[in-house]
A protein has these predicted regions:
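N-terminal small-domain helix-loop-helix segment of the aminotransferase-like
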Residues: 2-93, 100
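Conserved PLP cofactor-binding pocket of PLP-dependent enzymes
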Residues: 16, 302-311, 325-345
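Short acidic capping loops at alpha-helix termini that bridge into adjacent secondary structure
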Residues: 34, 84-88, 108-111, 155, ...
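PLP-dependent aminotransferase class I/II
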Residues: 69, 217-301
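PLP-dependent aminotransferase-like
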Residues: 104-161
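Active-site pre-lysine segment of PLP-dependent enzymes
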Residues: 127, 145-154, 167-190, 194-225
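Conserved PLP-binding catalytic core of the aspartate aminotransferase-like
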Residues: 283, 287-325
Length: 346
């Protein structure tokens, strides 16, 4: 078929992202029940009660199109973060913000630099727009910022940094981040993925929002999927200088964030009690897992997120054996950690 033949090679060679198996599929496949999903870094406490109530109260409005500007959520988040409303953009998960940035700022043949063992979607999206990825290995399970800076070439337009990193749960700290910024051209667009930033307890964690200036192109990505427990609604956001946001808005679909997601996110922002319960549960769960892994003499990477990377030997085999027992974890062979699995703190 000529239509297929005309598709660019960079599209035909894409390997689709494989999400973790849903509980229903595992139980159907193995004939089991009461499975536990520890694969996708979801909040085990679920959504905020206020978010659920907000959605229930407005279900009769589902015949109406959503607010394409996310006005009320934009105003609330602007106030909470202390940023101008015009510097915010919302997406169908923060994944969509990554895609919008790539479509806006990358041309075919342009390069993007990222860590080799970071969220695989970065490389997939870069390839999907005809860009090229330069992947730099982690050092001690975290971003090697000097090596990332050294990987920049004349074709580099964009760099991805995840802090904390997925799947390792590690962070880079303020001093090394500031040294890194001093090494990097301000013309390189930095996309800083902070999907798990709320879980960080290290006082030296650098909040990238504090480094936004008109001279430095930074997009900070955050999400309602993790701490706020709204993964099924798909809603995330980006913060960047208004000039960048204005360009990204031109390629955004007009109604990309559905109405229930906006209602729930707005209510979740106002539920400090649920946030505290979620963070407390994560802290206790992390301490428990680290203690048990130590008792079992299993090496693990100290985590600043809501998951932990643990070395189990044959990662894929352990994943399959746990799957048959109704425990779903995430194998990390695709991240070049064949001896590990990633376990959500549940």
């Amino acid at each position: 078929m000529k239509t297929v033949e005309q598709v660019p090679e960079y599209i035909r060679s894409l390997i689709p992202y494989e999400p973790g198996k849903p509980i229903e599929e595992v139980e159907r496949e193995y004939g089991i029940s009461n499975s536990v999903k520890l694969a996708s870094n979801e909040n085990p406490l679920g959504p905020s009660p206020k978010a659920l109530a907000a959605m229930r109260s407005k279900l009769e409005q589902l015949n109406l199109y959503p607010d394409g500007d996310c006005f009320y959520l934009r105003q609330a988040l602007s106030k909470k973060l202390g940023v101008a409303a015009e510097t915010l953009i919302f997406g169908n998960g923060s994944n969509e913000i990554i895609e919008l940035a790539a479509r806006t700022f990358l041309r075919p043949g342009d390069e993007a630099v990222m860590a080799e063992q970071a969220f695989v979607v970065y490389q997939l999206i870069v390839q999907a727009v005809g860009g090229r990825s330069r992947a730099v290995p982690l050092k001690n399970f975290t971003h090697d910022l000097p090596a990332l800076a050294a990987a920049v070439s004349t074709r580099t337009r964009m760099m991805f940094l995840a802090n904390p990193n997925n799947p390792t749960g590690t962070i880079f700290r303020r001093a090394e981040w500031e040294r890194f910024l001093g090494q990097l051209s301000p013309d390189i667009l930095l996309i800083v993925d902070e999907a798990y930033f709320e879980y960080v307890r290290d006082a030296d964690y650098p909040d990238s929002l504090r480094y936004h200036t008109h001279e430095r192109a930074i997009i900070t990505l955050r999400t309602f999927s993790k701490l706020y427990g709204l993964a099924g609604l798909r809603i995330g956001y980006g913060v960047a200088p208004q000039e960048l946001i204005s360009l990204m808005q031109r390629v955004r679909q007009p109604f990309n964030v559905n109405a229930p997601a906006q209602w729930a996110a707005l209510a979740a922002l106002d539920d400090a009690e649920h946030v505290k319960r979620s963070l407390d549960a994560n802290r206790r769960g992390l301490e428990f897992l680290q203690k048990e892994f130590t008792r079992l003499r299993l090496e693990f990477v100290p985590s600043q997120a809501n998951f932990i990377l643990v070395r189990v030997g044959r990662g894929q085999e352990v994943f399959q054996r746990l799957l048959k027992q109704g425990v779903i974890v995430r194998p990390t062979t695709g991240y070049r950690f064949p001896e590990h699995v990633r376990v959500t703190i549940g």
